[in-house]
């Protein structure tokens, strides 16, 4: 891996680029000014990449010094737009309630644990509500969607989809992906189901539960899609009201309207549009809306980019080890 001057990286220098060969992806001209970098996760690493070219830069490396495999795996990543701080989840061991959430500066300095091991079971995709100063994430084996303050305090459980003890191993209850629509007060999340089992769900709840509702009784919950192969991560285009997601079952990136038609059946919706195919265990997805592009990652070590309609797809990294969450910042 190459390195950058920390001051340059913190200031966003080295990120002032336009995606090479894709200045007008989908026919939309790229806006002037510095373009965002990609930030993404390896098993025990936080990395960044200039999507116009160059090599990945490792910001944080928690790999065991003896070369052994990490006991926990990083999964969800988000960057606070105002502070530049990077937040990410680590799943810990799947059979133990030992997941945690970390934070560092944009250049990788000042690594801090803000949710200590066991504060969440197996935290997955992570998002920031900057207006409310809250972190939101899905908890896989914890079978829940949770949130906390930006310093890790005041952890709340918004919805519970199963009992981690009684339902252990029931992957249909595993919460994985997560996205936010703060303007309308909605949280979107996936339940992946078994491996390519056609049990996958995409659901929506309110950020604020209705009066009288509990985490185990969310009468406001809406199932938007069911019987998906194995949906993983989410992102939203709020302007066009479009939902994007990766699916590890058919190894795709897809999109569909956020607002389902009246009287719809989540099991038979026909408005899913597959945009990218052939990924190696698809995981992360992130939209760069001003530049009409998206990025995606896979457990097979891929970091790819494409226009929002899937055109112009190409790989930036094709052998990066096990890769998970991704975001632009």
Q: Which residues does each predicted region cover?
A:
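An edge-strand/N-cap motif at the start of beta-rich repeat modules
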Residues: 30-57
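Short loop/turn segments immediately following beta-strands, especially the blade-tip
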Residues: 205-214, 257-265
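A short beta-strand motif characteristic of beta-propeller blades
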Residues: 55-68, 110-116, 155-168, 219-225, ...
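Short loop/turn segments immediately following the C-termini of beta-strands
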Residues: 41-43, 91-92, 140, 192-194, ...
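N-terminal export signals
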Residues: 2, 8-24
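Residue position within the beta-strands of beta-propeller blades
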Residues: 40, 88-89, 137, 189, ...
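Structural motif
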Residues: 45-48, 96-102, 143-146, 196-203, ...
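Beta-rich, blade/repeat-based domains predominating
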Residues: 28-35, 68-82, 118-133, 164-185, ...
């Amino acid at each position: 891996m190459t390195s950058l001057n920390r001051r340059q990286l913190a200031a966003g220098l080295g990120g002032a680029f336009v995606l090479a060969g894709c200045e007008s992806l989908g026919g939309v001209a790229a806006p002037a000014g510095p373009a965002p970098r990609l930030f993404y996760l390896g098993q025990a690493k936080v990395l960044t990449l200039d999507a116009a070219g160059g090599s990945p830069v490792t910001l944080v490396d928690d790999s065991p010094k003896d070369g052994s495999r990490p006991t926990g795996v990083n999964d969800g990543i988000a960057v606070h737009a105002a502070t530049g701080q990077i937040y990410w989840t680590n799943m810990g061991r799947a059979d133990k309630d030992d997941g945690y959430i970390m934070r560092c500066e944009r250049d990788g300095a000042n690594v801090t644990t803000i949710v200590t091991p066991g504060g969440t079971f197996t935290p997955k995709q992570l998002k920031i509500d900057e207006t409310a100063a809250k972190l939101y994430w899905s908890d896989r084996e914890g079978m829940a969607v949770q949130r906390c303050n930006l310093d890790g305090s005041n952890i709340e459980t918004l919805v519970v989809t199963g009992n981690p003890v009684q339902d252990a191993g029931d992957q249909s209850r595993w919460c994985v992906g997560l996205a936010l629509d703060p303007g309308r007060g909605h949280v979107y999340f996936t339940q992946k189901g078994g491996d390519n089992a056609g049990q996958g769900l995409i659901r929506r709840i309110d950020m604020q539960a209705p009066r009288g509702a509990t985490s185990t009784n969310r009468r406001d919950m809406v199932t938007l899609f069911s019987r998906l192969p194995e949906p993983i991560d989410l992102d939203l285009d709020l302007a066009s009201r479009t939902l994007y997601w990766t699916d590890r079952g058919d190894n795709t990136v897809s999109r569909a309207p956020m607002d389902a038609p009246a009287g719809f059946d989540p099991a038979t919706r026909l408005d899913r549009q597959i945009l990218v195919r052939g990924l190696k265990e698809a995981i992360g997805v992130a939209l760069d809306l001003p530049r009409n592009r998206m990025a995606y990652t896979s457990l097979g070590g891929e970091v790819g980019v494409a226009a929002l309609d899937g055109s112009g797809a190409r790989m930036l990294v094709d052998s990066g080890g096990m890769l998970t969450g991704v975001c632009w910042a």
